[in-house]
Amino acid sequence: MKLVDQPKFSNGNILAVSLDNYYSLGSCKTVVQYIKGPNAATPFGNGSWIDYWSLVKGNNSNDAHRWQFLNYGDMKIGDFGFAHSLYYTVASGFEGWETSKESDKAFSFVVRPYYKLTDISKITAELGFFTETTKYQNGESENYQGQKATLAYVLSPDAGNWKSRPELRFYVTYLHSNDTQALVESPSQDKKVVMNDGTTYAPRDNQVIFGAQLEAWW
């Protein structure tokens, strides 16, 4: 593969402002960020393939910019608890596939209520939603959406503290997506989706998962 002259990248700049609120029932944190330059495309993990196209096509995203808004927090009332996470972002002017200038916006929201059963156990639920829309220079656009619902039995040293770790979760999760290739079932020849390794799967827009998860912080 022949590479063109490497593009000249400008320095990336990030300006962030955060506000922390602490009150008797819990806490809440709000963050607003403005990102200018090539790193404006990285929040969705786009950095690797943007670097690739920059080397191959000689592009850069020096004029790209992004706004991000984050809000998350927790609240506790007796044996009941509640946590949430909200994220919104909008960006434009970054290089995508080939030489197109792209813009995107995305929103996600997750809530996680729980009920403490004993000092070391609790029942928790999790509801989540996301949507992302990307617009291309040629006028075309793509939209992806997904939802999830989880119910879990959780063991931890202090079940009333959402930060308590290590944590063992036994869970069942329902997933739904409008991108049928995001969720796949057992191999099938009826509706072909060929993966990179040549495996053929049948696409689907929903999935149920049972599992166990061990999480530790240090």
Residue map of PLM features:
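Residues in intrinsically disordered, low-complexity segments of regulatory proteins
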Residues: 48, 52, 161, 216-217
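Tryptophan-centered motif/residue detector
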Residues: 117, 177, 217-218
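Outer-membrane beta-barrel "beta-signal"
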Residues: 151, 155-157, 201-218
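Extended hydrophobic secondary-structure segments that form protein cores and membrane-embedded regions
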Residues: 1, 29-34, 166-175
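C-terminal structured domain segments
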Residues: 140-198
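Short, P/G- and charge-enriched loop/turn segments at secondary-structure junctions
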Residues: 82, 199-200
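Detector for outer-membrane/organellar transmembrane beta-barrel domains
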Residues: 2-137, 143-151, 155
